[in-house]
Amino acid sequence: SEFIGAGDWRLAFIHRDRVESTTVEEVNAAVQKYFIPTNRTIGNFIPTDKPERVEILHPEGVAEMVASYKGKVAMDVGEDFDVDYDNIQNRLDSGILPKSGIEYGFINKANRGETVTLSFAIRSGNVDDYMNKGVTAGFVASLLNKGTQSRSRQDIEDALSAISSSVGFSGRNGLVYASISSTKEHLPSALKIMTDMLKNPKFDISELDKIKTQRLAGLESSASDPQFLAVQRMRQINQVHSKGHPNYFPNIDEQIAMIKEVSIERIQSFYNNYYGISDNASLVVIGSMDVDMVKSYFEDNFSDFKSDKPFSEIKNPYKQNVAANENIITPDKKNAFTIGMLSAKTTEVDKDNAALQIAGIIFGGGFLNSRVATRLRQQDGISYGAGAQVSIDSDPDDKNSNLIIYAIYAPMNAEKVQIGFKEELERFIVDGITQEELDSALNGWIQGQTVSRAKDNELSSLINNNLYFDRDMSFQASLESQVSALTVEKVNAVIKKYFKSLDQWTVVNGGDFQ
């Protein structure tokens, strides 16, 4: 497979023939060229007369050992939770907590081991509030678990370890997101730790410096990576917002400058001005819990955690992508990467949503059996990984959706990759799909949704989105009904509407193409 990935299976025999005909002079020339001091790893072998060895005893009497063994008390296996849309909606306890104003959605169910998953989203501010704030929001969230007024970072880690729980934070301009993974017994303790981190953080300069160093090092290591650079350039070509806007996408130099500008003073100021509940917060808890305890806890502990910044979503409306096909040269990189983006003016609530999702799966969603993977990986044998995906906007106003294609390959195969994408797009648009492809995609999509709803963390995310967009599980049920009713003709019509020839995409190729 390595030779196929390099371009052709017959390279294996060419390699064999070359090895057979190699001369001493050629080997010595290669030594001089490649075995240079800066490309060596040296180790020393120090022999000893009496090496110390470790002997592992072979166990005997295994049958007798296990014959009388009695295990621990059996763990509660939990209930067989029905992930049918109607059942989820019927089990969902939702509403708004009167004192804190938090919108909630709880599913109290008997989980194996009495596990529970919690997600808490706080939204505040508008686009003007977050102008010229750079990357500060992300740094504030990253520092929340690094220490509080009464707990050090180690204290927090020890306390969570003692109750076998985890607490995580993430944030961006306009949003801070907290999550807890725990058990019914330890959820109250985990909530106290999360609350302490969220309401009483202690921003330490040494912890800030560590995060800045890590992120700068990450940028430095990615500065010559074909995939990183190609994605960066694709986004910059389609830059919509001016510098300073929360949705502005900076280049690497600008990202470095933004990171270096972050200070403890900026962190504290951002926290003081934007952390707290204004008029938009949502709480989703799924698993084994005392519902009344959770409601009372958030009422008692977050009614005074206020922000005076009413929330207004930072809009990111649709704009047609720029048609381009650019190369980025990354010397000495064995892998090359191509990514393409095509904008699509549609949203989750549009009638084309179901067919467009299925079209995306057929074109590039499967690991080995999609159009893109079959052509570039199996038929041409030129890609280590190739595919496509459709990203459909949830916002009914922005309608900022897009289609993505990508491939990883050896630089020598760059032209073949371009030809493959070009021809497969043309064939997809002109000829459409088959009934067999449709049936396979429908079954895969429905099974995937069923599995996703059986995972508490993914179900939590789904319910959080429903709360935010003021909808319930009937939205997902309706989408599945639309997917199930799709025909070849409906999908083909959507393909012709949204898929375009390669020359209309924003395509960026990164690799050592010299």
Question: How would you describe each model-predicted region?
Answer:
Residues 13-123, 130, 282-330, 336, ...:
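Proteolytic maturation boundary segments
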